[in-house]
Amino acid sequence: MDAFVVLVFILSCLFLLSLWRQSSERGKLPPGPTPLPLIGNFFQIDVKDISGSLTNFSKVYGPVFTLYLGRKPAVVLHGYEAVKEALIDHGEEFAGRGSFPMAERYNKGLGIVFSNGNRWKDIRRFSLMALRSLGMGKRSIEDRVQEEAQCLVEELRKTNGSPCDPTFILSCAPCNVICSIIFQNRFDYTDQDFLTFMEKVNENVRILSSPWLQVCNNFPSLIDYCPGSHHTITKNVNYIRSYLSEKIKEHQETLDVANPRDFIDYYLIKLKQGNYNQQSEFTLENLATTVRDLFAAGTETTSTTLRYALLLLLKHPHVTAKVQEEIDQVVGRHRNPCMQDRSHMPYTDAMIHEVQRFIDLIPTNLPHAVTCDIKFRDYFIPKGTTIITSLSSVLHDSKEFPNPEVFDPGHFLDKNGKFKKSDYFMPFSTGKRMCAGEGLARMELFLFLTTILQNFKLKSLVHPKDIDTTPVVNGLASLPPSYQLCFIPV
């Protein structure tokens, strides 16, 4: 009995200590809902609609508030003004990468997405340089995307106008563009090694967007001891790591320092130059992780946006008709669309922007962290605190985009029908951590969609009013429901 009393006393003390520590921290941080010991505010958040939960909290606590994800606090920025003030006006201080236990487990602080400090700066700077050298923003990259767009059209023709799920084909195209940049070569859509690699990358992104993974990230101790889809990520990462190791080995054996062929070659040259420096961030392990990051960030995100775009065009046939009319007027039927066409196609440009705004692909962005102690809007945020930026609150701001829950390309058109830019358009985030592949993604979306609509009419299997565009998953990423359509050659 005495032992039981002692145990209860110890547990009570730990409980009170946890309450005291959280109370002390909350006195310095922005206000927020009262957390429970150990689990924080987890049960106050709808893991199937995190953005909706953040919006509800912001109505009570304002645009800057604190949530406890497990035992650790995170500061949430809600609305354009708060997000801009942090990520742009105080970009350096908010440029850290916040806690993401599942990614940290496999990336070990390496790569371009989840690294921090000088390591992140060095790898990002190098990656941007290498991509520019390979033609990013130039005609050479555009040629690759146009080539892939024609391959995509040929694959769609093979459906013979029959109902099909576009997921597979729309995944192959952007993945092949990344392959041509990383490995020099594209792959046939029937290449089994390519297909397996692509599926492993895409499956990991889907799992990371699931509600269960939000639980794992908040309570990382579950990762080792609980069954679940997170173990599939481990198997996939091991496969991807092995696949990339073979590719890197092939590049090492055929490397010509005077004639780099692709991203891996540029990295291997940089690695050779840094061999004398024991502190160099350029290692083979970091190369494999960086390449894995480039695939994860540059394939599933673009293919998901393409899938969502076609679904929205099926839902809104009047929009599709206007886009195809503009394609006929500007491009015609006898040449391939090119990036120079975009400035002459304001409605098409507006449609693509509206797709990205409406679907809100990464609702709460990847977590940031402050790189130093900072006073922000009269609140004290300690170094290392995780920062959650609600991109949903910016992309669906009703002042900037009237009726934001309605799909309307007019959100990006002025009264004269010309394309209208918006500072609120930040599907790729903003500031220091803005997506390094934004330019490539914008090029792919324009060229793939215009080439598809130049060559096919889209036919839905159901009436447009019966098409549901509600995302089936709304965690890390918003994923569209499965659907079928017919590509009718024109």
From Swiss-Prot:
Induction: P450 can be induced to high levels in liver and other tissues by various foreign compounds, including drugs, pesticides, and carcinogens. Keywords: Endoplasmic reticulum, Heme, Iron, Membrane, Metal-binding, Microsome, Monooxygenase, Oxidoreductase. Specifically expressed by males in kidneys. Expressed predominantly by males in livers. The keyword Iron applies. GO terms for molecular function: heme binding; iron ion binding; oxidoreductase activity, acting on paired donors, with incorporation or reduction of molecular oxygen, reduced flavin or flavoprotein as one donor, and incorporation of one atom of oxygen. It is an enzyme of class 1 (oxidoreductase). Pfam families: p450. It is a peripheral membrane protein. It is found in: Endoplasmic reticulum membrane; Microsome membrane. Belongs to the cytochrome P450 family. Catalyzes the hydroxylation of tolbutamide and the N-demethylation of aminopyrine and benzphetamine. This is Cytochrome P450 2C27. It comes from Mesocricetus auratus. The lineage of its organism: Eukaryota, Metazoa, Chordata, Craniata, Vertebrata.
